[in-house]
């Protein structure tokens, strides 16, 4: 066994092959220890791999191409024409000051033939505190993957929130324009306009969504199983989404019908 190098390095291991462990003085210069790979730094170490490089966005939809070429510069132009947003990069390009917050991360289990499979469900709210809010839900095997997926889903679900006044139209809009109601499963949330300076009178979950939507003063009423955070957040999101569903008297004025961005820029879309 001694002639073959023994068990330590008899089969070409890190010790130097069948000839046994190579003496320290016979090692070639510059290769270091640990099998001749220069130790921990031989492959660049932790810093040698670098972070993830951001690749340039290549849009795959017509709307994405128009946004990248600055043909569309606001989210309102997209909402007024009811254009579906299929790429989250569109939101990043038009609304760069979005803030996201993780509402909850809960483990969920599924019974399989091999046993219980555990995954993680993430609820993420996103908004710019200026009339745009979104809510995303994602389930994944890892927490980080679930959060990233929920952020993408929230960006694709960003909706405009209409703000109004409680009494006289003095200053900037600060509350919801009228009473609105949202429902999800057994949870029902009602948003009620409030005077300036009242603040958001609400439970913690709707308060975060209302704050991200840019609403400063609001009364809320909720009923149902509000302990279910997911349904509570979805009901609040549905209520905020309905702020543009009511045609109040200040919107009765008729306006000329404009062409959609696809019609205005059809020549550019045909060339590219």
Swiss-Prot record:
GO terms under cellular component: cytosolic small ribosomal subunit
Record InterPro entries: Ribosomal_Su5_D2-typ_SF, Ribosomal_uS5, Ribosomal_uS5_C, Ribosomal_uS5_euk/arc, Ribosomal_uS5_N, Ribosomal_uS5_N_CS, Ribsml_uS5_D2-typ_fold_subgr
Domain S5 DRBM: 98-161
Record's compositionally biased regions (Gly residues): 7-22, 30-48
Region (Disordered): 1-57
Annotated GO MF terms: RNA binding; structural constituent of ribosome
Disulfide bonds: none
UniProt keyword Ribosomal protein, yes or no: yes
Domain of life: Eukaryota
Keywords: Repeat, Ribonucleoprotein, Ribosomal protein
The keyword Signal is assigned to this record: no
Record's subunit section: Interacts with ztf-7.
Family affiliation: Belongs to the universal ribosomal protein uS5 family.
Purpose of the protein: Component of the ribosome, a large ribonucleoprotein complex responsible for the synthesis of proteins in the cell. The small ribosomal subunit (SSU) binds messenger RNAs (mRNAs) and translates the encoded message by selecting cognate aminoacyl-transfer RNA (tRNA) molecules. The large subunit (LSU) contains the ribosomal catalytic site termed the peptidyl transferase center (PTC), which catalyzes the formation of peptide bonds, thereby polymerizing the amino acids delivered by tRNAs into a polypeptide chain.
Name this protein carries in UniProt: Small ribosomal subunit protein uS5
